[in-house]
Amino acid sequence: KLVWRTEESYFFRWSKYADRLSKWIEEHPEFIAPAFRANEMVNSFLKNGLQDISISRSAIDWGIPVPDDPKHVIYVWFDALINYITGIGYGTNDELFSKWWPCNLHIVGKDILKFHTLLWPAMLMAAGLEPPKRVFGHGWVLLKSSQSDDSGEKMSKSKGNVVKPRELLTVFNGNPDPIRYFLMREMDFGQDGLYSEEALLTRYNSDLVNGIGNLSARSLSMVEKYRQGV
């Protein structure tokens, strides 16, 4: 049953920074990458208007106490994003902070790009700080259910369809290089990529064993035979 509740909360005036965010993105085309992600952020969120966002709770007692108002605690995205700067000395070590901020690059998942390219820069602007120079939103590694599956499915702990890297390493006797090769070969950074163990083994055998492996073996054999190994 749906129960409506009312709760006192502090809000961050996100809407106040919509124009500044639009100008920043326009003047810094490298800020959001890949470029099509920038279009998503602008067209799906900025153009529709930003709503002020709740940043505190008063009905729970876990979280970071709000300064001067201990009845409220800060939670979720607002405090999580601040970790980027408090972890490098903001407010406690100016020399350390100036060494590392503004940062060159955030790499985040596409599902949290909105918070890192619209909310986080607005928070920094409110604090008089410069946003990161670039935020790159990478895609997901989707699990193929079969060889004919061209769309894949997002991995989920609740569904139990996750790939466990340590177990996968045992397939190659602990060597991660075949897995790295597959990911670099098959997946376009920034886009979603499809994974299956069958596809991994097929690529391993066709490229690394039959292709590069055979070429290396033949080349080394000829060097040894005709050039005395030099």
What does each model-found stretch correspond to?
Residues 2-228:
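Structured secondary-structure scaffolds
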